[in-house]
Amino acid sequence: METRSKLMLLACATFSIISLVKSQNQQGFISLYCGLPSNESPYIEPLTNLTYISDVNFVRGGKTGNIKNNSDIDFTSRPYKVLRYFPEGIRNCYSLSVKQGTKYLIRTLFFYGNYDGLNTSPRFDLFLGPNIWTSVDVQKVDGGDGVIEEIIHVTRCNILDICLVKTGTTTPMISAIELRPLRYDTYTARTGSLKKILHFYFTNSGKEVRYPEDVYDRVWIPHSQPEWTQINTTRNVSGFSDGYNPPQDVIKTASIPTNVSEPLTFTWMSESSDDETYAYLYFAEIQQLKANETRQFKILVNGVYYIDYIPRKFEAETLITPAALKCGGGVCRVQLSKTPKSTLPPQMNAIEIFSVIQFPQSDTNTDEVIAIKNIQSTYKVSRISWQGDPCVPIQFSWMGVSCNVIDISTPPRIISLDLSSSGLTGVITPSIQNLTMLRELDLSNNNLTGVIPPSLQNLTMLRELDLSNNNLTGEVPEFLATIKPLLVIHLRGNNLRGSVPQALQDRENNDGLKLLRGKHQPKSWLVAIVASISCVAVTIIVLVLIFIFRRRKSSTRKVIRPSLEMKNRRFKYSEVKEMTNNFEVVLGKGGFGVVYHGFLNNEQVAVKVLSQSSTQGYKEFKTEVELLLRVHHVNLVSLVGYCDKGNDLALIYEFMENGNLKEHLSGKRGGPVLNWPGRLKIAIESALGIEYLHIGCKPPMVHRDVKSTNILLGLRFEAKLADFGLSRSFLVGSQTHVSTNVAGTLGYLDPEYYQKNWLTEKSDVYSFGIVLLEIITGQPVIEQSRDKSYIVEWAKSMLANGDIESIMDRNLHQDYDTSSSWKALELAMLCINPSSTLRPNMTRVAHELNECLEIYNLTKRRSQDQNSSKSSGHTVTFISDIPSAR
């Protein structure tokens, strides 16, 4: 007995009536029939009497598919008439309310049934929270085409996300989800969760056993082998009070070797030789032994001796391997051999096999998950990425949400929330206060009403608060001054009254703020507040602007061509001819004129010479020169100088060795194809250039002609925005748009701008969204040979099929990360929203594109790490911040 206690874990007792009653009442059971319409009554499965409800309230996306033919399928006795499939997005998640710390049997079922008529078995990944559970391959099995995945898992929080993740060209689908609570002291692994390999009971009856015979709805599959003989009894066998409770139909049957001198051997295959496996062996002596009969046998697992064992008479026991097993070559074996004392052969009634699966990534902080999902529910945020864990894995993080992910064992925290231009209505929800680690909160450009709530003072880590361009009322609250880290507050474009509180003014005028650890911060940490203070102040500002405008207008009348600043950049026409070698090499042509190649002080330059036939020539020339003389940004093309002599007008730019983006996407440039990280880098840098025009210039500027031909590429494929002849400035504050004649390029024009002649910075966002579609797809903006000639309509039609490969540029040869590309595509579609108020600003666009690149790099590093781990020695990988062109 001492040896037994050391080598085996023992579970033995009488049958638990209480446990049986609870389970038969389906207490704690969750049974979802996926695809069942919400207006239909719950389905009661006739064989088990289990009640299945529609999954509509547990998942946001997906569509119902109808099984073509299931008349010849008896797949675990479940209904298979409909299913749910997910043609949109990359990750689609079910969100289930569970009890934290509870051990559940979680079962997912996938029955394809050729619902789509394609006869192509789907393949995709299945995630439990932020961790991958398994890769699902729904292939034909035993005359059907179904797969069951089952796991025993202890929930970490009170929300459980089960996610289907698209990995290729096929569409994820699911038929049913089942959760069954288990006793806390059953199925215990030292680490990780337990993935079911098999539940066998030894009989040749052919009968599957499950609920209600099994109180936990385990599915027991009958199993026999040619060298075995089955025995059984009609007498009841006592069960367990501590949790395992095998059904009577399972424990009342057993197998013995037909040749009583031979051992009883059971083998199974592990998925990998590195897998850790637990075996649960069920025994009960079910024969009435004579006085001179004895059944005793040795138990060996993978050739290792464990115990000499005698089954109890009509009383069940479960013997569990005390530590996880590893099976050499992937072949595992349990062998029962009778001892010299035994007169009867060994027997076994049933066996369960589980492999250990690790879920190392911690879920996002529970309180913050609840808060962000309440925010989502309150404002009806319908972003497709807002499913599952908001922070991890990073490639699926929610758009507009940034997190602090320290390591896999520490729950991530939400540190930034950007819901700008998201169509939010109502008051500022109190749920935001539960995101206690927020550093940045952007609720700008919505239709929020009410006062700035006191609950925001609980955001003690907040550095930047943007509430601009809403319909907020009341006074600027004094409590904002108590948020010590707060650096910037944006309040313009609201209906706030009164003056700025003295406490905020004191902080604004203070040369040093007392922050953490009693240290002082420099003046750059002061709070900047932009708010409507009084009608008098506004009136004064308007009068001053009118006065300045009239003076400028008067000055314009006096001087037909006003002199330009920084005359040291002004060149004579003869110098222009000399630097271009008498206009020898043409780089390009446009409505403005011709661009020539030139040299200035042995440096290459591009010289744009204005055509005298250009209708708006000098006006656009003047606009571009004045803009480029006062703005300087690494992602805006630099002006070297200009010529303004009579009718001879020219602009001299820095030379961009690799031409424009469109040449590379179309293949007209020749040479290697831009790879995926290279395209993302170009998109990021272009976005930063536009962002600078919108928020870095004083006054802000709208480019008005963002397109792929106006994105130039340097020697190392660094991107710079060019051609500012159509740019317009707009005022900040209450002014939301500039009324102007429509100008720009067909295909890139914001439909709202085109229809209303209203120009805003969101017009550039729309145009950039078109460029982003070009970058992703490699398709021209307008192509008459396509069924859908306009790239926007074409992209929407392809998205309806949910096939990323059909959308991505074929020249990439599938060499891209699916998660990164889906995120970029979703961002592009957000940018081209017909309503400008629902488009993101360029700051957010640049941020999301950076995340796309981070996701790609992370996936690449993981792949490299996996490859390097297979070889000896150390490998150092350098990740360049300048992706190369291939």
Curated annotation (Swiss-Prot):
Q: Which residue ranges does the record annotate as region Disordered?
A: 863-886
- Topological domains (Extracellular): residue ranges? 24-528
List, alphabetically, the Pfam families matched. Answer: LRR_8, Malectin_like, PK_Tyr_Ser-Thr
List of residues that carry Phosphoserine? S739
What Gene Ontology terms describe what this protein does at the molecular function level? Answer: ATP binding; protein serine kinase activity; protein serine/threonine kinase activity
Record PTM Phosphothreonine, positions in chain? T740, T745
Gene Ontology cellular-component terms for this entry are:
plasma membrane
Ranges: LRR repeats = 413-436, 437-460, 461-483, 485-507
Question: In the UniProt record, which residues carry a glycan?
Answer: N49, N69, N232, N236, N259, N292, N434, N447, N458, N471
Which residues point to the Cytoplasmic side? 550-886
Recorded family membership: Belongs to the protein kinase superfamily. Ser/Thr protein kinase family.
Protein name per UniProt: Putative leucine-rich repeat receptor-like serine/threonine-protein kinase At2g14440
Organism equals: Arabidopsis thaliana (Mouse-ear cress)
Lineage, broadest ranks: Eukaryota, Viridiplantae, Streptophyta, Embryophyta, Tracheophyta
